[in-house]
């Protein structure tokens, strides 16, 4: 039945989200975190929730299995886009719009893609400086930290990946014929990518 299927989707999502939270705690402050480990955390912690929500929408609407899977994939890719943009905003956003200080996630030990990428690209002197800044980021150090992220294309790399996941989310919609909902979902994908808070 649909109820049982929905319960299975929710149970799986809840389990993966809990595992994602545990992985995030295990990796807190780990400046050797890899891109693959980062994506495992955000997939489990964030993307799986959006995937489940979209899949459940498909189940409730009586979508055929292929469309249900397409909705699940759309949600997964939207979740990855959302988290990547969130991580970019942690380093570039406006404090008033975000409601938190620039670098707040980093100060809480969350190592995210922009820093992972910059550390991987930097030579030893800049790598050492990035590590110093990351371990004790004070407000007056934020401009230097942002400059190092920019120097190594870290924010552009994260934006590029967010764009790729947005396109994948949009591709998932190709299975659906023309309808207002498809248009709305396309708009949502673009708004998620362009958000500033």
What are these regions (language model features)?
Residues 1-197:
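All-alpha prenyltransferase/terpene-synthase fold signal
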């Amino acid at each position: 039945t649909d109820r049982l299927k929905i319960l299975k989707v929710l149970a799986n999502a809840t389990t993966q989200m809990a595992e994602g939270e545990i992985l995030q705690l295990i990796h807190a402050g780990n400046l050797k975190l890899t891109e693959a480990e980062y994506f495992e955390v955000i997939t489990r912690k964030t993307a799986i929730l959006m995937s489940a929500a979209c899949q459940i929408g498909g189940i409730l609407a009586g979508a055929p299995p292929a469309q249900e899977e397409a909705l699940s994939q759309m949600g997964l890719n939207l979740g990855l886009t959302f988290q990547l943009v969130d991580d970019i905003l942690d380093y570039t956003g406006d404090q008033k719009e975000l409601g938190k200080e620039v670098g707040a996630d980093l100060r809480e030990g969350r190592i995210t893609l922009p820093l992972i990428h910059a550390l991987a690209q930097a030579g030893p002197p800049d790598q050492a400086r990035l590590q110093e800044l990351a371990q004790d980021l004070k407000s007056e150090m934020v401009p230097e930290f942002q400059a190092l992220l920019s120097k190594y294309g870290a924010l552009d790399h994260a934006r590029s990946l967010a764009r790729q996941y947005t396109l994948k989310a949009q591709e998932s919609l190709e299975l659906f014929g023309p309808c207002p909902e498809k248009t709305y979902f396309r708009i949502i994908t673009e708004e998620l990518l362009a958000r500033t808070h």
